């Protein structure tokens, strides 16, 4: 009887360990689809590159899905500049035939597009770390779905930011509490 109880307890511990580590596995293409497949806003919380003019950083960067297939992602991209909310429609091609699932955002007005590679996905916080190249350097970005953004708004104690820190890049914060309260 003791052997049976011991085997049962070991099985429970083993299963709990698998479930705890499941959030840290290398992300796959379905993780990318699951992350993007929401009608909520997805916020850019942290980014390693500075967006905006000198002393006028863009803030409250977000995307809201308008169409999602296994090949394409269309969305409304919004941000706040000089206290004014601005939005534009954008689209991306989704790729599963690479080491990391990719979202290739089409360029606007003749500018080249950007390839974002999903490097990390946390199912409990609904956050994702994307890698991309800018000016010949590897950069990172942390995006979070709206319903968990207040839990992951750059606090160093959560797994999302720890994964971001693995990129070993600068950290500019693009989300704050005013992003949800100010419409202009």
Regions found by a protein language model. Give the residues of each.
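A beta-rich soluble binding module of mature secreted/lumenal proteins
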Residues: 2-184
